[in-house]
Amino acid sequence: GENEPPKKKAPDGCFGHKIDRIGSHSGLGCNKFKPGH
């Protein structure tokens, strides 16, 4: 619905494509990426 909370985790376990490329070359991955960091 329209009142759904912001998605903190994408279906793939990533936080979106913005950090997707960052995690890919940083080696941080998606699951290890902590929200708010």
Swiss-Prot record:
Origin organism lineage: Eukaryota, Metazoa, Chordata, Craniata, Vertebrata
Matching SMART domains: NAT_PEP
Family stated for the protein in its record: Belongs to the natriuretic peptide family.
Organism: Pseudocerastes persicus (Persian horned viper)
Tissue specificity annotation: Expressed by the venom gland.
Function, as annotated: Increases urine flow and decreases blood pressure when administered to rats by intravenous injection. Inhibits thrombin-induced platelet aggregation. Stimulates cGMP production via the natriuretic peptide receptor-A (NPR1).
Subcellular location: Secreted
Name the UniProt record assigns to this protein: Natriuretic peptide PNP
GO CC annotation terms, alphabetical: extracellular region
InterPro entries: Natr_peptide, Natr_peptide_CS, Natriuretic_peptide_brain
GO BP annotation list: regulation of blood pressure; vasodilation; venom-mediated activation of G protein-coupled signaling in another organism
Keyword annotations from UniProtKB, A to Z: Disulfide bond, Hypotensive agent, Secreted, Toxin, Vasoactive, Vasodilator
Principal subcellular localization: secreted
Disulphide linkage map: C14-C30
Molecular function via GO: hormone activity; receptor ligand activity; toxin activity
Coiled-coil segments on the chain, per record: none
